[in-house]
Amino acid sequence: MNDWMKNIPSDYLVSEINLPGTHDSCAQYIRFSHISRCQRNSMTEQLNMGIRLLDIRVKFDGEKLKICHSLLNCKKDKRKKEDLLFDDVLKSCKDFLMQNPTETILIIFKREAGKNEEATYDYFYNTFVKNSEFFYTRNKVPSLASVRGKIVLLNRCGANVENAEYSDENSGINLSGWPYQNSRKDALLQKVAIPERSKKSEQFFYLQDFFNLNPKKKWELAVLPTIQNSPQDKAMLFNFFSGSNFFSSPKRYKRIIFKRFFGYELMPMKKYGWFVLDFPNKKIIKKIILTNY
């Protein structure tokens, strides 16, 4: 599954492709793993399995951009001594794309802790993005043709609006309006505006990210209705399977929701959007990918 996108027509927008993704993609080696671990596979393993959407949470300490899950730092290996850095994530992505130039990787970039969003994005942009040939940074959903071999930046961080250096050309797809959905009384798919600097925006994306419903309710009220009623337009659609609360760990959510998902028949060539998963296996990734053909 390392090069499955080679068979997708190049004129498709990436939002028209059903993508398997991971939630808190780097939370493999982490303390308090019962409640905080979300992945069993490394970044490279995920990409080779077919994952194309990565959820990267960061903490800038003034010197380094560390990968974290909430306040906990993600670690490089099972010894849990050395912090995982964005440098490591980027190297894994670059190495994969150089070996598989037909593919694209979408990164949701979010400041989770540490310095404020302005300082975090300034460091991220100037250190990793500026003058890089690997990043697609326009505030517009691209065609697959324009981003094969590249990383599409989905920016939840919110670049400093006072900094004239930033524009709709170099700050990524603007997801800074991403709402906290658990404050809502319903679990219905939400339509969220994508702000633009240069003009009044008509862009939007769809979001289902209710993470503190119990697993059965999460499937019944959030995940399944999003699958059944997925809008067939060209907007991005995020459908999070992940969840965690006092009574249920990420692994329990995965076990209950995956079992129901495997029992639900998906239709080929229907748009379902982007599935954001904890602990995905090859079987569920293949099920998602095959809907594109």
Task: Report the location of each language-model feature.
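Long, acidic (Asp/Glu-rich), low-complexity accessory segments flanking structured domains
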Residues: 1-53, 60-99, 104, 145, ...
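Short, conserved, surface-exposed binding loops centered on an aromatic residue
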Residues: 142-146, 230
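Acidic beta-strand-to-loop metal/phosphate-binding motif
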Residues: 104-111
